[in-house]
Amino acid sequence: FPYTTLFRSAYQTKRHVLRNEIFPVNVAYNVVLCAREYVKIENYDRTSAGFRYHARRTAKADKREIYVYVIGEASRAANWELYGYDRPTNPRLKALGDEIVVFRNMLTQSNTTHKSVPMILSSVRTNEHDELFRRKGLPALFNEAGFRTWFLSNQSPQGAMIDKLARDADSLIYMGHPRYDMQLLDTMKRIVEADTENDLLFILHCYGSHFSYHQRYPREAAYFLPDDDVAIERQHKQKIWNAYDNSIRYTDTFLSSVIGYLASLDACSALLYSADHGEDMLDDDRERFLHASPTTTCWQLHVASLAWFSEDYKRVFPQQAAAAASHENAPATTHALFQTIADIARIEADYVYREASLASPSYDTTVRRCYLNDHNRAV
């Protein structure tokens, strides 16, 4: 028996090395893996056709409800002033003080947008990745619960799972050039002013801090200088960091403006934000840059995330607002985001679990945090 176990282990190890690490076997394996994923995405409309959350709202406010779910891009926590960074990248959010809840221990489930965002829009955990192609996403959940749903994207359609899930919203709008995130707020304002009756969910998919960083903000928003477009070399590190930090500072302006607008409305409202993944920025001797590498880093995993609740929300649903504040330092992954926004809206449904919501007193801090690797396995 021990010899059988040893042989099986050695065989599996050899198979893993051949498949994942030896050229050209790994190339062939990855081509097959990508082809299989492509087929699953293409078949999504069919495989998810009969899916229902059986959602219902357990409580409603005494005025209309507006919830904003903001998905950031490539925004690592290490460069946010709110997380202890020594540059003023969050002056406006910092000025809000205790009005915002900063989730300080949030890790992404994937360091690539095309994997991370679908999971942020879904109830699926990393260890059940194939369920992504059977279940509907957040727009469908809120539709069932009686909300009018809007998906506003500052990124181009790619024909991938993000677009499949986004199309379940009642309305889907892709922004045009220039792709500055403030246009998401401008569009949201027009919608809110035109629709004064419905409870609303807005999903705002930002361009955030996507490379090239200097293109993510208008020139008048350039605070850290010089921020020239330069070759990715260590000698230009400060200019690269200046541009990246300017993009974070522009996100600060954008989020604080969304919060300010929500606060001005006669509505029960809340905002939940998280970046999809972080970024490497030539941080150490490895000189790693960007994200999506097969072996990840703390800078790619640790993302910025926060919540805000209106005074009306805190009056009507004090338990959820207080629970979120109590979990500022709780260990979490972006899996909690779907669960948290559903809980904030007081939605009960299949695949909605209070113990996975940061806005629930019963949030479970003991759950092992997993990451989806480049072979779609939870590690």
How should each PLM-predicted stretch be described?
Residues 129-134, 238-249, 293-302, 314-341, ...:
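A short beta-strand-to-alpha-helix junction
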Residues 1-6:
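Short, small-residue-biased leader/transition segments that mark boundaries at the very start
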Residues 68-69, 250-290, 338-345:
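Metal-dependent active-site segment of extracytoplasmic phospho-/sulfohydrolases and closely related
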Residues 7-69, 74-231, 302, 333-335, ...:
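Active-site-proximal alpha/beta segments of enzymes that process anionic O-linked groups
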Residues 84-88, 267-268, 272-318, 354, ...:
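Histidine-centered active-site microenvironments of extracellular/periplasmic hydrolases
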Residues 279-284, 346-379:
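C-terminal cap/loop subdomain of S1 sulfatases and analogous C-terminal strand-loop tails that border
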Residues 52-53, 186-189, 228-271, 301, ...:
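A long, amphipathic alpha-helix that forms part
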Residues 220-237, 288, 312-321:
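Flexible internal linker/loop segments at domain or repeat junctions
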